Regions:
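Surface/interface-facing alpha-helical segments and adjacent flexible terminal/loop regions used
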Residues: 1-158
Length: 158
């Protein structure tokens, strides 16, 4: 029989050496309701990280939409792949809808994440436009589109 202290030591070392096996064992312990043997410290950290990963994914999709919308509006080059930018926007919009459908509480993060995403999007759009020979110096200081416009499947910037 595994003692509580032995289980704690095994859990911690397993967490560091074989995460998948650690996770499977934690799930089994939860299923068996053997809560006293759980690696609570790492389990709490992992559960918290799960929520963070979904927020990060949401911000990343918003950033992609903003980058390509900025490029659609500000690109003056004749070599720009507008169709690819639009496809990327459509894919990111679908991904956001799936995230919100699966995790409705994420919708509360759209506004604050969009503000942060815009900062990174302007930096990335500037770099990417330079790759196409567009030397655009600056973008609006705040996002020129509403959240509804960013995620609506029929909206395209002009």
């Amino acid at each position: 029989m595994i003692t509580k202290q032995q289980g704690e030591v095994d859990n911690v070392s397993l967490y560091e050496t074989d995460f998948v096996k650690w996770a499977e064992e934690q799930a089994a312990l939860l299923t068996e309701r053997r809560f006293d043997l759980l690696d609570l410290e790492n389990l709490i950290e992992e559960v918290d990280d799960l929520a963070g990963r979904h927020r990060d994914a949401l911000q990343s999709h918003l950033r992609v939409i903003m980058i390509h919308m900025l490029k659609l509006v500000y690109s003056t080059g004749s070599r720009n792949p507008e169709h690819a930018w639009k496809r990327s926007i459509r894919n990111a919009r679908k991904a956001i809808r799936r995230l919100i459908d699966n995790y409705p509480s994420l919708s509360a993060y759209l506004e604050p994440l969009s503000e942060r995403a815009y900062k990174y999007a302007t930096e990335d759009a500037h770099d990417e436009l330079s790759d196409y020979g567009d030397d655009h110096e600056s973008f609006p200081t705040s996002c020129p589109w509403t959240l509804d416009e960013l995620v609506h499947h029929e909206f395209w910037p002009r």
